[in-house]
Each structure stands twice: as structure tokens, then as C-alpha cells.
Amino acid sequence: MADNTRKPALKKSGPKEDRHFVTALARGLELLACFRSGDRLLGNLELAERCQLPKSTVSRLTYTLTKAGYLQYDSGSGKYRLGSATLALSSVMLSRLDMRQLARPLMQELADFSRSMVSLGMRDRLSMIYIENRRSQTALTLSLDVGSRIPIASTAMGRAYLAIISESERTDILERVRELDEILWPKIRDKVERALDDFATYGCCTSFGDWQPDVNAIALAFRPADGTAPLSINCGGPAFHLSPEYLLKEARPRLQELVERLRRTQEAM
């Protein structure tokens, strides 16, 4: 598999000023992204806490987004839900991801073989968001579904993504991770560096108890042939069922084969 033996560099850089960056637009998009899987209604106070913005700023943003159709105001609760314009964007994005349809049967094969959960994800800022999910019917799996978000720096899926992107993009992402938690950053950085070593050694990235102490996973990222953003596929589940040895020895070759089959299928289309 291409590029699986070259260890990506990991560097640190300071924050960058960008005169082309539109702060008001970024805040509006950040507010929309505060709605998580399972959220039905959120008020200005909840949104302000999640976005870490003043409530007055959030009030102006929700007013504008409601006028534009990206939020819908619920008069009974005084809160907001995502509007039809937002849902239309999501629908268009998912409809373009033909990889989901191609991946489903292959992901199910791996899930059944390993009695685990196999998920396909893409990056959204400092998270990976599940866009497809397949579970084994014969084993306990994690309670995550399409739309679930997991952190980029502590999960196998996120680390696999970091391993294949450009050095400049990786540096920018990790700088934002550092800004979120200066105290834990040295530990996070060391874990990411170790994950890049895993990528060079095994051709995949790992997270054995790093995200959650009772969860083990491996993952591999790849660039779709159609030029869209990189995607990651993980294979994971409860640590008592999926040992690191099993995942690396038994599941890893099948995960690598899955990605190769996806590439070949998409290139032939």
C-alpha cells in the first residue's frame, strides 16, 4: 500500500494570523456545529457555553441564522433546532459520498469476522465524524452511530487521518488541539508521535485504551480516487474482547485489504 512505510513528521508551530479569515462567518458555522447527534433543541445559553462566546454574540448569530433558514426557532421552549437549509447541506454532502455505498458490504465482512464495530469517518475540525457504521450481530459493540463524533488526537481513526495528511495541515490541527488543553498537551503530543510510529511500523494507527480505557481500535486512512477529502476506517470495540494482539495480527491485514479493495473498485468506476 502506498505511503504506509514513511513516517510523517510532527512539528509544532505557533498561531497564525490570516487576514482573509472572516471571524463572524466562522462563529456562525461554529454555532451550527454545536448541535450534536441526539440534540433536538438548544437555547442561547447552552450554545454560548458550547461555543465559549458571549450570550449577546450568540443571540445575534441565532437571529441571523434563523432568518437565513439554518436554524428554526421553537416558540414553546424558546430554543432552536437545525433548520431546513442546514439539513439540505448535510443531505447534499452525504449524497456525494459514494464511498459509503461501496464500503458497506466490505465493512460488514470485517465486522462479522472480528465481531467488532467497523466505522468510516471524515474530519470535522478537531473531531472525526462517523458517516457509515457496521456492527457484528454476535458481539457487544460500542454505542456509536452515524453522526457520532470522536476526538481526532486520541482515537485510532483520528490518528490515522493525521498520519496521511500534509505536514502543514497536521501541524495546524495539532496546534489547535494544544490550545484546547495546554496541561495535557505533552501527553497528547507523545501519544500522537507514537501513533505515527505505529503507522510506519504496522501501516495503521492504534488506540489501545487512550480514548476510553476499555476500548481498543486500529484504523487506516486513505484518499478516495475522486479527489475528495481523506477518509478513515477503524475496527474496534471493548478491550476485553479485542486485544491489541488480535487487532494487529488478525484484523489489521483484513482492514488493509478492505481499503485496497475500495480503492480498486472506485478506480474502476
Q: Which sequence ranges carry the predicted segments?
A:
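Short, solvent-exposed recognition segments
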Residues: 2-11, 139-211
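Extended hydrophobic
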Residues: 185-261
